Amino acid sequence: MITFIICLVLLVVAYFTYGKYLEKVCKIDTKAEVPSSRLYDGVDYVPMPRWRTFLIQLLNIAGTGPIFGAILGACYGPVAFLWITLGGIFMGAMHDYLSGVILVRNDGLSITEIVARYLGKGAGAFMRIFSVALLLLVGVVFVVSPADILSTRFELIDKGWWLAIIIAYYFIATLLPVDKLIGKVYPLFGFALVAMALGLLGVLLFGDYTIPSMTLENLHINKENLPLVPTLFITIACGAISGFHATQSPLMARCVNNERECRFVFYGSMISESIIALIWAAVAMAFFHNDGGVSAALAGHTPAWAVNEISNTTLGVVGGILAILGVVAAPITSGDTAFRSARLIIADMLRLEQRTKWKRLVICAPLFAAGVALTFVNFDIVWRYFAWTNQALATVVLWCIVVYLHKERHNYWVAIVPAVFMTYICASFVFVSTQFVGMGAVPMAYVWGGVATIVITLLMAYKILRSRKALQ
């Protein structure tokens, strides 16, 4: 229990300390004109209250990530607490906050355009294709997974109808101005997501459950089957650091009222997500403690099953409702904003303004046609690569932040250390995982990961040294 409490306190304190320090690093200007007012179009560039942009950002970046990922991460033992806490504070929240500030200072453009601006046209072109494909994949999977769950719970309605209903909702949400549907409905889901986490926190603190504290013996369980490096850092993405967040942040970067709000909206939402992930990891460890641990309990089951079991048992009838929220509403709200982000990336790439409905339709129609077609594809193999691509995207954004801070003569060490670390995680995963080279957790795999990291770091150092002169 004490490890969990310490990590929880550290996350809260970090918002008021490290988050405040990052504000000084960025030299926040409260008088600077922001995109929501300067580029107001009534569709995507719309100023909204700070509390609303925070809740929408939280729901956009969360989805099922801090729930399912944390439950799977709990298989590693209490070491998951460390990664969620330290990763959330120094990597994830920093990544979300600094990329959010950069987006606000660059007209709220899509992250792909920011990468092109700071890492070069080649990197930008790759990121455009990579990001649209990733967002399309996320959107489609978040159509299929809730449809599966709903068709199981409500057998009178066929899965095909659920697919049609969800896709129709996605299309409308992607097409409408951000304040008409997302701005009104999502804060309610955001409140519910927070309420679910707080309810489980109450159960942990005051219920008859024991959260394992971290010791040398249980620091990392299942060492033989679950190598800590790099798989833990790939498994727990949302809650620690996630590149998907950078694709979602432009939505709210176009809605903040001033630069000061960025810490609350971007750093605060990521810290909140880390707290949610920490709670779910702790709940999973405590709930399945007498069943042989999380790994044994999940054998033959999915994280969605675990959410349902935990929620119904610990929170009763209310828990059943919240379980539906966690495994249905959360992915749906991330899925539609994934499609919306894809629309914005394509619009920014084509320099196609989105004020009029027909120009939004020009992008939405083929985008959703591709999405509908992909719902009939088996994603079992492709989806295995999502976790790695998500962290690879985060790594690219971290290097982009480094270039920006170096160019602006700010303290770039806050980003370069996480960038090098995540480069090593992604590189070593390529050599260790059977999804790629498949060498396994042998010393040589880690050596090759280190060599790849050194090469990439040297290339980025060359880019950084050139960037200041090129961008002046």
What role is predicted for each listed range?
Residues M1-F16, G73-L103, T112, Y446-I454:
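Extracellular loop-to-transmembrane helix junctions
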Residues L10-I67, T231, N258-E261:
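Membrane-interface "cap" regions at the ends of multi-pass membrane proteins
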Residues Y15, M91-D107, I111-L175, A237-I241, ...:
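Helix-loop-helix module between adjacent transmembrane segments
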Residues P49-G65, V203-Y209, N218-W280, L325-S334:
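Hydrophobic, membrane-embedded alpha-helices of multi-pass small-molecule transporters
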Residues G65-I71, D107, S131-A147, I234-V256, ...:
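Membrane-helix boundary/coupling elements in multi-pass transport proteins
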Residues K121-A125, V132, G160-A164, G268-A277, ...:
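Loop-to-transmembrane helix boundary motifs in multi-pass membrane proteins
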Residues G139-I165, A173-T174, L193-H220, Y404-Y412, ...:
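Hydrophobic alpha-helical segments and their helix-loop junctions in multi-pass secondary transporters
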Residues L205-M214, Y267-E309:
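Extracellular/periplasmic helix-exit of transmembrane alpha-helices
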